[in-house]
């Protein structure tokens, strides 16, 4: 038993020595010279206040192997905890990173959505205008197209798929329409068995993705297609062309239709 106790007795002073923590004299503490967006916390010696490390920044953790401790990163700020990184490649030296403990989405008094309490705290210290959380969950917002459909082409008889992504709260609902060139748009999929529309949540939080699929395309399918995202706060739309080619590689129709809704 005396060997493990001896090792502990040797290691603990070594850790304290690495930190070089002398006698604490708060009067000698220097105020932070930078803007502290994660709040003020006691330093690793528990004496002076320093700027806390922000979410995603490296930090010093006693759980790391001794050679990798006390690298001068400092402690984490408000609502943050220093944890080992789990995204390192094999063979990389161990590191620790500040992780937010309060991960619930919040709606700020500035009308912006914050992914967690730590992001709202950063904004509050930066703006210094009394920013606070109004309620849990995202703020209401009109849809915004984050990834519009792109022009697609294929030969007669081939298939085409287009996608469209949007964010908003409440979660938007998608509608697809086709402009056949006379200024009028037709909702899809209508009653055409060769046209299908699918939607699902993602890929990001509070985002939705919709797909339009056209099977066995014909010259009549050469047109402009619109994706429209709607919710109670408004709507957003984007368009792209479908070009139908013949087997000589030329376009079957040169209608040049890019009309708005």
From Swiss-Prot:
One GO cellular component term: extracellular region
Ranges where the Ig-like C2-type domain occurs: 143-243
Residue positions the entry lists as glycosylated: 154
Annotated PROSITE patterns: IG_LIKE (PS50835), IGFBP_N_2 (PS51323), KAZAL_2 (PS51465)
Cysteines joined through disulfide linkages: 21-45, 24-47, 29-48, 36-51, 59-82, 76-98, 100-118, 107-139, 164-227
Positions marked as site (Reactive bond): 102-103
SMART domains: IB, IG, IGc2, KAZAL
Molecular-function GO terms, alphabetical: insulin-like growth factor binding; serine-type endopeptidase inhibitor activity
Domain IGFBP N-terminal: start-end pairs: 18-101
Leader sequence residues: 1-17
Localization, UniProt: Secreted
GO biological process per UniProt: regulation of cell growth; regulation of signal transduction
Expression tissues: Expressed by the venom gland.
Kazal-like domain location: 70-141
Pfam families given in the database record: Ig_3, IGFBP, Kazal_1
Keyword tags: Disulfide bond, Glycoprotein, Immunoglobulin domain, Protease inhibitor, Secreted, Serine protease inhibitor, Signal
Name this protein carries in UniProt: Insulin-like growth factor-binding protein-related protein 1
Annotated source species: Cupiennius salei
Taxonomic lineage of the native organism: Eukaryota, Metazoa, Ecdysozoa, Arthropoda, Chelicerata
């Amino acid at each position: 038993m005396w060997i493990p106790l001896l090792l502990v007795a040797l290691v603990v002073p070594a850790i304290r020595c690495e930190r070089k923590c002398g006698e604490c004299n708060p009067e000698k503490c220097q105020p932070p010279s930078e803007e502290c967006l994660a709040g003020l916390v006691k330093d690793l010696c528990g004496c002076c206040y320093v700027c806390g490390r922000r979410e995603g920044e490296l930090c010093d953790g006693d759980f790391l192997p001794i050679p990798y401790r006390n690298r001068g990163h400092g402690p984490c700020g408000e609502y943050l905890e220093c944890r080992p990184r789990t995204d390192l490649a094999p063979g990389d030296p161990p590191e620790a990173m500040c992780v937010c403990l309060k991960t619930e989405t919040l709606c700020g008094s500035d009308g912006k959505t914050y992914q967690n309490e730590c992001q709202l705290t950063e904004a509050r210290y930066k703006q210094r205008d009394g920013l606070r959380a109004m309620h849990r969950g995202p703020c209401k917002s009109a849809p915004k197209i984050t990834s519009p459909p792109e022009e697609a082409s294929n030969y007669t008889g081939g298939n085409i798929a287009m996608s469209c992504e949007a964010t908003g709260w409440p979660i938007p609902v998608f509608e697809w329409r086709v402009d056949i060139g006379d200024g009028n748009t037709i909702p899809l999929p209508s009653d055409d068995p060769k046209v299908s529309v699918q939607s699902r949540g993602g890929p990001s939080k509070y985002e939705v993705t919709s797909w339009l699929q056209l099977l066995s395309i014909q010259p009549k399918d050469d047109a402009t297609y619109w994706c429209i995202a709607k919710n109670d706060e408004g709507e957003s739309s984007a368009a792209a062309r479908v070009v139908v080619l013949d087997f000589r590689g030329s376009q079957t129709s040169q209608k040049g239709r890019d009309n708005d809704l």
